[in-house]
Amino acid sequence: SGGPFREAYNLSYTDVYDFSNVKQGLKKFGIELGMHHQEFGERWDQPVDENKWEMAAQYCANDVYITEAVFNSRKADWAARLILAELTGMTPNNSTNQLVSKLIFGEDRNPQLVYTDLSETFPGYEWKQLSDGKFHNMYRGDDVGMGGYVYAEPGIYTNVALLDIASMHPTSLINMNYFGKYTKNYADIKEARIAIKHGDIKKISGMFDGKLNKYLGDPAILSDLAFALKIALNSTYGLTSARFDNIMKHPKNVNNIVALRGALFMRTLQDEVQKQ
């Protein structure tokens, strides 16, 4: 076979870059962590003079030191990876996407996803091609983008309210039943995270067939669990609109309906607030 042997990846235990939620090069990590930086100006496809071997070794060692420092600085990500691996019966070497897919869909590799036409929920919404030749999410005369709609009126304001919508994108995904029969599994992840935030240990103990119970006695580990569930929630709705094919992307979802639903709601809310 000319293809890769999948299990060969598990010759390693994990990949720091993969489990880190911050995706950047080792050099940038080193700078941010205040580590010593060392370059080696020799060509790697040519023999190195013996009098420079020690310098080459120092260069390689420097990368190891920075990798260890990155691991220590991303311990919360690592704890989350271990928890997701345990919940799914997979390994810490599996990617976050693989772990979350297993947590939601189990062994089903072709789940039947549900696409919702949001023009039925928000009359007047259009996925429309404009003069630039590209399609845009248009609603009430505005391009609301692909999610994350922002509106502001310049000025100085006092005595203002700061309001937040909890878990807007995950809630949209659940309300649209995007994952079909597996939507409940995703909803359970959200409910478990909320229960942890509210200290509702009794509710958590009955979820995921009791797999979470071992984490409930230690507040520090409970915090790691909450972070693991947050990663599962956030990585999921990103995959629904990814540019590449994956188990969570519906082929019709070119307009990013999970984030779009929230943007359409906020644009509707804008008009209602301005009426007051």
Task: Please report, for each region that a protein language model flagged, where it lies by residue.
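Active-site-proximal helix-loop-helix substrate-binding element of RNase H-like nuclease domains
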Residues: S1-V64
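Active-site-adjacent bridging/hinge elements
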Residues: G2-P4, H36-P47, N137-G145, D200-G210, ...
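Hydrophobic, Leu/Ile/Phe/Ala-enriched alpha-helical segments that form helix-helix packing faces
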Residues: F29-L33, F71, R193-I196, L269-V273
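Short coil/loop linkers at secondary-structure junctions
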Residues: G34-H36, T91, F179
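Active-site palm subdomain of RNA-directed nucleic acid polymerases
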Residues: Q38, L264-Q276
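Common nucleic-acid-contacting/processivity interface regions adjacent to the catalytic cores
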Residues: E50-E54, Q58-M176, S223-L264, T268
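Cytochrome P450 catalytic domain signature, combining two hallmark sequence patches
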Residues: N177-D188
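Conserved catalytic alpha/beta cores of large enzymes that bind or transform nucleotide phosphates
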Residues: Y186-N234
